[in-house]
C-alpha cells in the first residue's frame, strides 16, 4: 500500500521533518481511500480466487501463510498505578493450531450406514485393495479388487463371478442378513452420499463435484438418505470440474447395469510391479534412472523389461525425471527416445531407388471412412532436439555424416492422384484422407527441392453400409463403423524399435602425408577398425593416429554413441546386440464410431394378388436384399443402379425386403382372390383356383372322373340286370314274362321288341304303369340325396376348437411374435376369466465355444544381421510362422553400408515372422463352434385386470414366476436352429461357414492366422513366407508371402445370416442368439392364483343371439357382429371366442338388462362358424365372409383357418348335389343288378 495514504486501521503516519510554520493552504479535496475500501477490495479478490480454485479438477491444499509480525507502535507513557501484566489474548493475525475438519452431514450419514455393512479387502501385506458390501443376502465386491475380506465370517467365502460385469458375489451368512443393505432402483437427479461426502447424479452419470476419491475406493456404496444402496463404485475418471464415476446400478427388474466413462480407471489399489536392471529389482513406477540423466542406461533398462506386463508404467516413469526443485516442464513423450533415419525407397523423384528421409514403411487402410494411417522414416511433431513441437518435423539429412535436420510440417505432403488432407500426426505416424489413386507419394521440401517416395497401392472411395457412396452425405442415418482415433494419446499397439547398427562414416577418417587419423566430432565416441597387416580396433574421443596404416580405405570409422532408438526397418543393419529391442506405442488406434451414410429414396410399391412390384431409383449402387419368412427363405441380393422395377411373390408367411440403408420392411399376403365363394359354380371355381390352384384342379378332376365312372357303372349295371332277367324268357318259346320283370325291364310281354314299342304299349293299355315306370328312377335319386344330406356332418373333418381347461390351465400358443392368443378359463362357481398370452420374443440361444479369432496379420521384417568374413546360424524362432535363412557371399569388399573387408565370405541372416495386426483388437472375426441350443421366450400374460411379463425357458421343466402366477412352457413343437455347427461372427453379423480347425490354417484362406484372443500368446500362422536372396546393391530383406485370408474372406463372405435365416429370425450376438423366430407352437401351463377369480356376481344373460352384419376375411378385425341379449341385471361381462377360427378384439363389454352390443372380430375363413360366450352364456355365429380388396398388409394374420371353415357352405351344397345325384344313380343301378341276380337265381 502506498505510504502517502493514511490508514486508520494500521499504524500511525510517518513523522514529518521540522519546517517553519506557515499558514495552511486550503487544498482541493482528494478522494481518500479508507481502510474499509481496502478491505472490500481484498475480500473481492479472495472470493474470486476461491471460485476459481473450486473450478479446478482437484482441490489443492491452501498455502501455509506465515504469521504476520505485530506492528511496532509508539511506546505509551507509563502510569503510576500500573496493573500486573496479564496473558495476552490471541489476535486475528496470530497463528492457530490447525484443527481436523469435521465431517459434513452427508459424510456422517454415509459413515454411520457403512459401519457394519462395508468390509475391507486386503492383500497379503495387509494393504487395503478395495471394499465389499453386504446387500440383499449377498456379499458383493468388484472383481478387480483382489485380496481377502477382513472379516472372520467372510474371509473364506467362495465368490461367483458375474456373467455380465466386473462383479462377483457370495452368499451372506444367515446371522448377518439382518444387517445387510437394501438397494433401490430409483435414481432421481439429486445428491447422494458416500464415504467422502456428496455424489451428484445428473444426466445419467454419477460425479463427485469436489474430485475426492481414488485408488482403494473401489467397492464403496453410494447411498440415499434412507440408507439404501443406489450404486457401487468401480472406478473414476478425472474431469473438469470433479470426477466422473464408473458404477453399477440396478433397473426396475433388478438387473445390474454398468455405467462407465471412456477414460475410467479402476480404483483398486494395484500391487506394485517389480522390474529388473543389471540383476537389481526396483518398482517399475520408480526406476533408478531416467532418460534425461542417463540415456544409454535408460534404453538398456527398457530393452531388458520389454516383455514385462508393466512396461508402459516403466516407460512413462523413464520419461519423467522427478526432482525436488521445481523446473520448467518440457514436452516429453515416448518418441523423444527415437530418431529419424534414412530408408530405402524403391521409387524416388528420379523413378529410381534411393535412401529417402521420408520413406513409407507401412500404410493401414482399415478405416471405413477412407482415412489412411501411414508410417514414414521422418518424425512429425518434433523439432531437431527431439522436443515436441506440433508445427515442426525432423528428418535425417543426406550429408556425410548424416545429420538430423528440421523442417516445417507445411513442407510435408501426401499425394495420391491429388493432394491428401492432413488430419493429425505424431512421431513416425500420420493420418490423412486421400482421393482415389493407384499409388501413395510422400513429399518433403528440403532446401528448395522436393524429396519424394512413392509406393504402389490402390486407394479408392470406401463406404460403409449398403450404399456405395463416394462422398459422405451431410444428412442421413448413423450406423456403426471403424475410424482412426485422431487424438495422439491413445495407443493402437506397439511398434518394434532397436538401436541402430554400426554405420561406417567416411568423414571420420583422415589421410595426411601417408598417415591415417581418426577424427571424431566434438562430444562423440568413435570406434575404428583397420586392416593394416594386423587387425586393429579401438574407441577414441579425440584425433588419433593409426599406426601402420597408410591409406584411408584400409580403415572404417563407426559412431559408438547409440542413445536413440530407430524403427526396426529391414533397410538398416541390426545392432551388435541382436536380441535387445524396445517398443513404442502406435498412435491413432482403430475404434468403433458412428458414420453418417445416405438413405436411398423410398421405393414405389404396387401390390397385386400375392405379389408386389418395387420401383427403385438409385443415384449410386444400392443393395436390395429380400427373403421369405417361411421355412424356405429364398434369399436374394442385388446391387442396383439407376431406375429399375423388380417383382416379387408374397406368401401368407410373409416377405421381407431391405432397400439400401433403409430399415427392413415386412409384408404379408392376404387371401384376396377374384370370384365369389358364395356364388355360382363358375364363380366358386374361379375364387378357389386363385387361392389353391393345385387343389382346385385336383378336386375338379376327381369329381369329373367320379361322375363319368358313376354314369358308366350305372349303365353297365342296368344293362347287365336287364339281360340276365330277359335271357331265360327269350330262350323259351311262347313263355309268359312276369308282370314285374316287364315293368322293371321295360319289356313287352307280347310282341314288343323296342323300348318305344314297350312304352307305347303301356301308354295305350295302362297309363298308370307308364307313369310308375318313369317315377321309379326319380324317387331313387331323391331318396339317395336325402340320405347324403343327413350323413354330411359325419363326412366332413373339422378341427376341434382350442379351449382352456378350467383346472389345468393348459393352452397351446402359436409361436408367432407379437401375435396374441386368447382363451377363457371357466371355473365352476366363479366368473369366467379371460386369459390372453402374447409371445413378445422367442430366443434360440445355442451353447457356443470359441475356437479362435483371426484378423489381418502384420509381417515383422527385422533389420538383417550381417556377418563380415564369416557365417551366422539361424536361431530357434518362437514367433508365429517364423522363417529364417542365411545367404552367403552377398556383399562385395567394403561395399556401402556393410563395409566388410572380405570379398565373398560375407553373410546375411534374414528372418521374418507374423504377428496380429495392431488393429486386430477392433477388426477381427471369431470362429465359433455351435452346440445344442436352448429356447427362451418372453411372454406377456393378461388374466383379468392383471398383466405380467415373464422370461421362461421353453423346456417343459423350468418354471417362471411373476408374483403369485407360475408358468411352465415347452418344449417347442419343432426343433429348429438357424445356426450350423460352425459360424463366424464379424462386427455383429453371423455367417454360417465351415472354417478350418485350430492349427490347420491354409495360406490365403480364412484362418491363416489363429489366436485364442487378441492379447493371447498362442498365435498360429501359415502365410507361406519365402525369403529371397538379397541383391548386392543395397541392404534389404526380399520375400514373398500369400495375401491375407481374412481380407479375402471379408470380400467374399456373402450375405449374413440375418438376411438369409428362415422363419424371419433376427440373428444377434453377445450372446449369440436368434430372436423372433416364428416357428412351431408353444405349449404353456399357467397356474393362475385364486385371487384372480371372483365368485359369480356377474349378469346372467338368458337370451343371447349372434348376428354377423359384415365380414371380410384375412384382414385386421374386418368382421362385425351384433350380440342381442336379455340379462337379469346390468354389469360387466367377459366375451370370448371359443374357436381359433375367429378372434375377438374386446375381452369384455358392459351389458344392460336388455339390448345389444357390437363387437369386431378377425378371421381367415370364408365360412366362419364360431361359438361366442358372454358371461358364461354361449351362442353360435355364422359368417359368410367376402375376400379383402387389399392384397398385402404389414402384419401377420391373427387367426388360423380349419378345414370346415376354409370352404363355404355354398360350395359344399354344390358338391353335395352333384356327387349325390351321381351316387344315387350308381346306387339304384347296383340295387337293380342285385335284384336281377337274385331273381334269375331263383328260376334256374
From Swiss-Prot:
Segments carrying the region annotation (Dimerization of the capsid protein) are 188-198, 224-228
Q: Which reaction does it catalyse?
A: Autocatalytic release of the core protein from the N-terminus of the togavirus structural polyprotein by hydrolysis of a -Trp-|-Ser- bond
The cysteines joined by S-S bonds are: 284-290, 481-595, 530-555, 532-549, 725-746, 855-920, 868-900, 869-902, 874-884, 1065-1077, 1106-1181, 1111-1185, 1133-1175
Annotated active site residues, numbered on this chain, are 144, 166, 218
Positions annotated as glycosylated: 279, 525, 647, 945, 1051
Q: Which stretch carries the motif Nuclear localization signal? A: 62-103
Identify the residues that the record assigns to the Peptidase S3 domain, covering every copy: 117-267
Give the lipid-moiety residues, type S-palmitoyl cysteine.
Answer: 725, 745-746
Give a short account of its post-translational modification.
Answer: Structural polyprotein: Specific enzymatic cleavages in vivo yield mature proteins. Capsid protein is auto-cleaved during polyprotein translation, unmasking a signal peptide at the N-terminus of the precursor of E3/E2. The remaining polyprotein is then targeted to the host endoplasmic reticulum, where host signal peptidase cleaves it into pE2, 6K and E1 proteins. pE2 is further processed to mature E3 and E2 by host furin in trans-Golgi vesicle.
Instruction: List every stretch annotated Disordered.
Output: 1-113
Query: In this UniProt entry, which residues form the Cytoplasmic topological domain(s)?
Result: 718-751, 1240-1244
User: Which segments cross the bilayer?
Assistant: 697-717, 765-785, 786-805, 1219-1239
Q: Where is this motif: Nuclear export signal?
A: 149-159
Name the Gene Ontology biological process terms.
fusion of virus membrane with host endosome membrane; proteolysis; symbiont entry into host cell; symbiont-mediated suppression of host toll-like receptor signaling pathway; virion attachment to host cell
Which intervals of the chain are annotated as region Binding to the viral RNA?
85-118
Q: Where is the composition biased (Polar residues)?
A: 35-44
pH dependence text: Optimum pH is 7.0.
Q: Where is the composition biased (Basic residues)?
A: 57-81, 99-109
Q: Identify the residue ranges that face the Extracellular compartment according to the record.
A: 268-696, 752-764, 806-1218
| Annotated region described as Host transcription inhibition, given as residue ranges | 35-69
Write down what this protein is called. Structural polyprotein
Amino acid at each position: 500500500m502506498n505510504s502517502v495514504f493514511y490508514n486508520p486501521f494500521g499504524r500511525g503516519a510517518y513523522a514529518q521533518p521540522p519546517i517553519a510554520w506557515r499558514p495552511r493552504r486550503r487544498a482541493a479535496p482528494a478522494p481518500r481511500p479508507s481502510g474499509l475500501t481496502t478491505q472490500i477490495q481484498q475480500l473481492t479478490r479472495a472470493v474470486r480466487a476461491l471460485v476459481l480454485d473450486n473450478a479446478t479438477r482437484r482441490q489443492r491444499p491452501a498455502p501455509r501463510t506465515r504469521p504476520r509480525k505485530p506492528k511496532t507502535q509508539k511506546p505509551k507513557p507509563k502510569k503510576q498505578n500500573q496493573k500486573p501484566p496479564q496473558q495476552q489474548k490471541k489476535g486475528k493475525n496470530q497463528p492457530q493450531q490447525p484443527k481436523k475438519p469435521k465431517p459434513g452431514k452427508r459424510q456422517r450419514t454415509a459413515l454411520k450406514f457403512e459401519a457394519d455393512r462395508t468390509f475391507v479387502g486386503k492383500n497379503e501385506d495387509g494393504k487395503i485393495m478395495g471394499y465389499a458390501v453386504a446387500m440383499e443376502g449377498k456379499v458383493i465386491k468388484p472383481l478387480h479388487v483382489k485380496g481377502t475380506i477382513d472379516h472372520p465370517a467372510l474371509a473364506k467365502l467362495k465368490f461367483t463371478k458375474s456373467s455380465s460385469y466386473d462383479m462377483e458375489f457370495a452368499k451372506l451368512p444367515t446371522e448377518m442378513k439382518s444387517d445387510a443393505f437394501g438397494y433401490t432402483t430409483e435414481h432421481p437427479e439429486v445428491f447422494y452420499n458416500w464415504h467422502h461426502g456428496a455424489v451428484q447424479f445428473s444426466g445419467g452419470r454419477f460425479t463427485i463435484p469436489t474430485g475426492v476419491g481414488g485408488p482403494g475406493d473401489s467397492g464403496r456404496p453410494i447411498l440415499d438418505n434412507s440408507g439404501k444402496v443406489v450404486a457401487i463404485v468401480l472406478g473414476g475418471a478425472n474431469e473438469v470440474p470433479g470426477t466422473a464415476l464408473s458404477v453399477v446400478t440396478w433397473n426396475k427388474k433388478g438387473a445390474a447395469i454398468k455405467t462407465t466413462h471412456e477414460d475410467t480407471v479402476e480404483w483398486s489399489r494395484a500391487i506394485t510391479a517389480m522390474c529388473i536392471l543389471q540383476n537389481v529389482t526396483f518398482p517399475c513406477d520408480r526406476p533408478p534412472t531416467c532418460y534425461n540423466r542417463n540415456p544409454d542406461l535408460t534404453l538398456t533398462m527398457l530393452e531388458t523389461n520389454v516383455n514385462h506386463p508393466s512396461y508402459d508404467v516403466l516407460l512413462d516413469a523413464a520419461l519423467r525425471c522427478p526432482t525436488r526443485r521445481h523446473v520448467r516442464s518440457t514436452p516429453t513423450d515416448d518418441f523423444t527416445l527415437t530418431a529419424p533415419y534414412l530408408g530405402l525407397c524403391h521409387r524416388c523423384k528420379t523413378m529410381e531407388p534411393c535412401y529417402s528421409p521420408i520413406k513409407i514403411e507401412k500404410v493401414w487402410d482399415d478405416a471405413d471412412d477412407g482415412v489412411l494411417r501411414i508410417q514414414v522414416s521422418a518424425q512429425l511433431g518434433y523439432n531437431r532436439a527431439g522436443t515436441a513441437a506440433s508445427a515442426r518435423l525432423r528428418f535425417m539429412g543426406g550429408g556425410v555424416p548424416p545429420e538430423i535436420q528440421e523442417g516445417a510440417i507445411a513442407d510435408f505432403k501426401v499425394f495420391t492422384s491429388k493432394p491428401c488432407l492432413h488430419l493429425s500426426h505424431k512421431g513416425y505416424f500420420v493420418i490423412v484422407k486421400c482421393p482415389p489413386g493407384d499409388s501413395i507419394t510422400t513429399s518433403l521440401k528440403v532446401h528448395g527441392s522436393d524429396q519424394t517416395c512413392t509406393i504402389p497401392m490402390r486407394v479408392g472411395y470406401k463406404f460403409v453400409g449398403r450404399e456405395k457412396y463416394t462422398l459422405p452425405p451431410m444428412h442421413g442415418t448413423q450406423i456403426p463403423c471403424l475410424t482412426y482415433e485422431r487424438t495422439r494419446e491413445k495407443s493402437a499397439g506397439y511398434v518394434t524399435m532397436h538401436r541402430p547398427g554400426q554405420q561406417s562414416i567416411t568423414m571420420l577418417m583422415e589421410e595426411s602425408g601417408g598417415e591415417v587419423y581418426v577424427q571424431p566430432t566434438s562430444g562423440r565416441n568413435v570406434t575404428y577398425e583397420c586392416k593394416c597387416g594386423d587387425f586393429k580396433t579401438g574407441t577414441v574421443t579425440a584425433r588419433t593416429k593409426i599406426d601402420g596404416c597408410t591409406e584411408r580405405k584400409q580403415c572404417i570409422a563407426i559412431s559408438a554413441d547409440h542413445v536413440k532408438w530407430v524403427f526396426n526397418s529391414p533397410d538398416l543393419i541390426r545392432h551388435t546386440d541382436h536380441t535387445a529391442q524396445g517398443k513404442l506405442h502406435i498412435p491413432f488406434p482403430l475404434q468403433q464410431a458412428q458414420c453418417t451414410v445416405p438413405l436411398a429414396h423410398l421405393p414405389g410399391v404396387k401390390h397385386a394378388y400375392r405379389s408386389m412390384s418395387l420401383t427403385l431409383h438409385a443415384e449410386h449402387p444400392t443393395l436390395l436384399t429380400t427373403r421369405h419368412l417361411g421355412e424356405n427363405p429364398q434369399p436374394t441380393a442385388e446391387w442396383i443402379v439407376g431406375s429399375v422395377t423388380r417383382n416379387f411373390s408374397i406368401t401368407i408367411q410373409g416377405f421381407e425386403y431391405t432397400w439400401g440403408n433403409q430399415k427392413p420392411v415386412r409384408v404379408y399376403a392376404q387371401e384376396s382372390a377374384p370370384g365369389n365363394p358364395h356364388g355360382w359354380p363358375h364363380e366358386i371355381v374361379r375364387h378357389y383356383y386363385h387361392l389353391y390352384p393345385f387343389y382346385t384342379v385336383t378336386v375338379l378332376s376327381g369329381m369329373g372322373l367320379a361322375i363319368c365312372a358313376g354314369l358308366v357303372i350305372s349303365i353297365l349295371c342296368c344293362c347287365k340286370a336287364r339281360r340276365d332277367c330277359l335271357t331265360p324268357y327269350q330262350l323259351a318259346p311262347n313263355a309268359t314274362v312276369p308282370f314285374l320283370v316287364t315293368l322293371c325291364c321295360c319289356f313287352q310281354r307280347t310282341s314288343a321288341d323296342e323300348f318305344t314299342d314297350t312304352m307305347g304299349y303301356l301308354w295305350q293299355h295302362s297309363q298308370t304303369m307308364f307313369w310308375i315306370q318313369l317315377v321309379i328312377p326319380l324317387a331313387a335319386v331323391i331318396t339317395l340325396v336325402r340320405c347324403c344330406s343327413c350323413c354330411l356332418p359325419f363326412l366332413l373333418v373339422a378341427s376341434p376348437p382350442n379351449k382352456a381347461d378350467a383346472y389345468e390351465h393348459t393352452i397351446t400358443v402359436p409361436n408367432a411374435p407379437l401375435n396374441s392368443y386368447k382363451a377363457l378359463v371357466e371355473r365352476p362357481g366363479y366368473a369366467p376369466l379371460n386369459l390372453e398370452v402374447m409371445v413378445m420374443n422367442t430366443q434360440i440361444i445355442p451353447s457356443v465355444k470359441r475356437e479362435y479369432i483371426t484378423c489381418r496379420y502384420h509381417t515383422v521384417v527385422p533389420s538383417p544381421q550381417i556377418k563380415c568374413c564369416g557365417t551366422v546360424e539361424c536361431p530357434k524362432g518362437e514367433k508365429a510362422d517364423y522363417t529364417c535363412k542365411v545367404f552367403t557371399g552377398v556383399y562385395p569388399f567394403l561395399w556401402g553400408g556393410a563395409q566388410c573387408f572380405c570379398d565373398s565370405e560375407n553373410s546375411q541372416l534374414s528372418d521374418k515372422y507374423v504377428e496380429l495386426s495392431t488393429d486386430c483388437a477392433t477388426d477381427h472375426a471369431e470362429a465359433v463352434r455351435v452346440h445344442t441350443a436352448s429356447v427362451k421366450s418372453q411372454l406377456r400374460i393378461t388374466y383379468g385386470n392383471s398383466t405380467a411379463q415373464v422370461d421362461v425357458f421353453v423346456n417343459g421343466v423350468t418354471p417362471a414366476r411373476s408374483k403369485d402366477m407360475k408358468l411352465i412352457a415347452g418344449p417347442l413343437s419343432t426343433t429348429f436352429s438357424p445356426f450350423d455347427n460352425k459360424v463366424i461372427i464379424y462386427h455383429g453379423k453371423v455367417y454360417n461357414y465351415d472354417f478350418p480347425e485350430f492349427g490347420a490354417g491354409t495360406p490365403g484362406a480364412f484362418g491363416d492366422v489363429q489366436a485364442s484372443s487378441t492379447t493371447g500368446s498362442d498365435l498360429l500362422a501359415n502365410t507361406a513366407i519365402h525369403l529371397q536372396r538379397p541383391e548386392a546393391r543395397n541392404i534389404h530383406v526380399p520375400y514373398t508371402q500369400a495375401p491375407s485370408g481374412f481380407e479375402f474372406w471379408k470380400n467374399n463372405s456373402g450375405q449374413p445370416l440375418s438376411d438369409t435365416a428362415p422363419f424371419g429370425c433376427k440373428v444377434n450376438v453377445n450372446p449369440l442368439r436368434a430372436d423372433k423366430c416364428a416357428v412351431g407352437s408353444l405349449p404353456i401351463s399357467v397356474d393362475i392364483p385364486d385371487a384372480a377369480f371372483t365368485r359369480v356376481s356377474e349378469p346372467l344373460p338368458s337370451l343371447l343371439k349372434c348376428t354377423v352384419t359384415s365380414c371380410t376375411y384375412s384382414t385386421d378385425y374386418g368382421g362385425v357382429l351384433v350380440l342381442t341379449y336379455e340379462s337379469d341385471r346390468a354389469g360387466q361381462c367377459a366375451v370370448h371366442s371359443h374357436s381359433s377360427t375367429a378372434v375377438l378384439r374386446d375381452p369384455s363389454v358392459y351389458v344392460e338388462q336388455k339390448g345389444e352390443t357390437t363387437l369386431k372380430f378377425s378371421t381367415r375363413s370364408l365360412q366362419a362358424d364360431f361359438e361366442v360366450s358372454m358371461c358364461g352364456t354361449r351362442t353360435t355365429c355364422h359368417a359368410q365372409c367376402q375376400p379383402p380388396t387389399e392384397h398385402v398388409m404389414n402384419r401377420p394374420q391373427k387367426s388360423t383357418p380349419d378345414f370346415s371353415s376354409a370352404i363355404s357352405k355354398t360350395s359344399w351344397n354344390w358338391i353335395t348335389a352333384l356327387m349325390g345325384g351321381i351316387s344315387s344313380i350308381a346306387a339304384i343301378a347296383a340295387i337293380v343288378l342285385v335284384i336281377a341276380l337274385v331273381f334269375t337265381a331263383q328260376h334256374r
